[in-house]
């Protein structure tokens, strides 16, 4: 390289001189992709169970029942939400509350 600025003519890459063993790779190799049935068999089945949840209405405290199907992690998370931050509302009280938090 001559001068302060690099020009394209100054940069010459000769891969054959640096690594003569470099060869192009055939992208259509002998590898086979698994079919859809094999993929389904390998996926673990998510175990869900049915639950009846009884919780008080957030306004009038009447008992509310809902039925859900959830994983063990989901039901524990839902339980924590009901204890800490989430309140269910009965049909009578839902009209008294503003929707969307506003």
Swiss-Prot record:
Zinc fingers (unnamed) by residue: 57-93
Pfam families: E7
GO biological process: DNA-templated transcription; symbiont-mediated perturbation of host cell cycle G1/S transition checkpoint; symbiont-mediated suppression of host innate immune response; symbiont-mediated suppression of host type I interferon-mediated signaling pathway
UniProt KW keywords: Activator, DNA-binding, Early protein, G1/S host cell cycle checkpoint dysregulation by virus, Host cytoplasm, Host nucleus, Host-virus interaction, Inhibition of host innate immune response by virus, Inhibition of host interferon signaling pathway by virus, Interferon antiviral system evasion, Metal-binding, Modulation of host cell cycle by virus, Oncogene, Transcription, Transcription regulation, Viral immunoevasion, Zinc, Zinc-finger
Main location: host cell
Post-translational modification: Highly phosphorylated.
Alphabetized InterPro entries for the sequence: Papilloma_E7
Location(s), subcellular: Host cytoplasm; Host nucleus
Motif (Nuclear export signal): 75-83
Region span, E7 terminal domain: 1-43
Superkingdom of origin: Viruses
Entry's Gene Ontology molecular function annotations: DNA binding; DNA-binding transcription factor activity; protein domain specific binding; zinc ion binding
Motif (LXCXE motif): 27-31
Keyword Zinc: yes
One cellular-component annotation, GO: host cell nucleus
Family: Belongs to the papillomaviridae E7 protein family.
Domain notes per entry: The E7 terminal domain is an intrinsically disordered domain, whose flexibility and conformational transitions confer target adaptability to the oncoprotein. It allows adaptation to a variety of protein targets and exposes the PEST degradation sequence that regulates its turnover in the cell.
Subunit structure comment from the entry: Homodimer. Homooligomer. Interacts with host RB1; this interaction induces dissociation of RB1-E2F1 complex thereby disrupting RB1 activity. Interacts with host EP300; this interaction represses EP300 transcriptional activity. Interacts with protein E2; this interaction inhibits E7 oncogenic activity. Interacts with host TMEM173/STING; this interaction impairs the ability of TMEM173/STING to sense cytosolic DNA and promote the production of type I interferon (IFN-alpha and IFN-beta).
Primary role: Plays a role in viral genome replication by driving entry of quiescent cells into the cell cycle. Stimulation of progression from G1 to S phase allows the virus to efficiently use the cellular DNA replicating machinery to achieve viral genome replication. E7 protein has both transforming and trans-activating activities. Induces the disassembly of the E2F1 transcription factor from RB1, with subsequent transcriptional activation of E2F1-regulated S-phase genes. Interferes with host histone deacetylation mediated by HDAC1 and HDAC2, leading to transcription activation.
HAMAP family: PPV_E7 (MF_04004)
Name of the protein described by the UniProt record: Protein E7
Organism, scientific name: Human papillomavirus 20
Lineage: Viruses, Monodnaviria, Shotokuvirae, Cossaviricota, Papovaviricetes
């Amino acid at each position: 390289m001559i001068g302060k600025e690099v020009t394209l003519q100054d940069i010459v890459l000769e891969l054959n001189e640096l690594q003569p063993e470099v060869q192009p790779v055939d992208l259509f190799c002998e590898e086979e992709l698994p079919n859809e049935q094999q993929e389904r068999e390998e996926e673990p089945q998510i175990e869900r169970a049915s639950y009846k949840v009884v919780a008080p209405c957030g306004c009038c405290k009447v008992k509310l029942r809902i039925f859900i199907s959830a994983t063990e992690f989901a039901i524990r998370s839902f339980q924590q939400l009901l204890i800490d931050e989430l309140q269910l509302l009965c049909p009578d009280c839902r009209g008294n509350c503003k929707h969307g938090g506003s």
